[in-house]
Amino acid sequence: MRGRELPLVLLALVLCQAPRGPAAPVPGGQGTVLDKMYPRGNHWAVGHLMGKKSTRESPYVYEEGSLKQQLQGYIRWEEAARNLLSLMEAKGTRSHQTPQREPLGIRQSAWDYQDDSNFKVIGPTREVGGLSASGSQPEGRNPPRN
């Protein structure tokens, strides 16, 4: 052990051996398992709450002038929740409707191979891997300059 850790270890040993004072009496043998686990009863949070008596820093404490703003905020949230609920209900009723189905034999393909108006005729050269068959640059591209 180092010299700095020795005082901490001694302090821990002294605190563990300190006698219990009358501030937290433990009934001898009487009580439930929870009483034995938490001998101080419902006052366990007192140490955590000490020093928290100031309410000025709390964001939940509103001054008198802002009470109206607080109520308006609640009303906005309530309206937003109602709108969201109505949208969800509308979507739910639409999703439960059965879709109109066509017989499988009459179904028309989404891509009409008869209509070739969207194709562009380029000519006899074919492009493979970015180069044309004749070795020249593809149409519309400038040759690289060194």
Curated annotation (Swiss-Prot):
Keyword Signal: yes
Gene expressing this chain: GRP
Name this polypeptide is given: Gastrin-releasing peptide
InterPro entries in the cross-refs: Bombesin (IPR000874)
Pfam families registered for this protein in UniProt: Bombesin (PF02044)
Secreted keyword on record: yes
Cited PANTHER family: GASTRIN-RELEASING PEPTIDE
Keywords: Amidation, Cell projection, Cleavage on pair of basic residues, Cytoplasmic vesicle, Mast cell degranulation, Secreted, Signal
GO biological processes: mast cell degranulation; negative regulation of voltage-gated potassium channel activity; negative regulation of voltage-gated sodium channel activity; neuropeptide signaling pathway; positive regulation of behavioral fear response; positive regulation of peptide hormone secretion; positive regulation of phospholipase C-activating G protein-coupled receptor signaling pathway; positive regulation of respiratory gaseous exchange
Main location per the UniProt record: secreted
